[in-house]
Amino acid sequence: MPKQKSHSGASKRFRVTGSGKVLRQRANRRHYLEHKTSRLTRRLDGVVPLTKADNRRVKRLLAR
């Protein structure tokens, strides 16, 4: 049986850590930043773990 292909869109958006957590970027940080407050853009900075409800679905897309 052939290997399962990973979803290329999901592989660009999510990263799996060594412990198995799935990390994602926050939304609303790409453009029109001049209209957003500095406080908001700082809050949207960095990567955050995915919710447990979505973990299984994303790992299946990543063929893990």
Swiss-Prot record:
This is Large ribosomal subunit protein bL35. Residues 1-22 are annotated as: Disordered. Coiled coil: none annotated. Signal peptide: none annotated. Keywords: Ribonucleoprotein, Ribosomal protein. Pfam families: Ribosomal_L35p. InterPro entries: Ribosomal_bL35, Ribosomal_bL35-like, Ribosomal_bL35_CS, Ribosomal_bL35_sf.
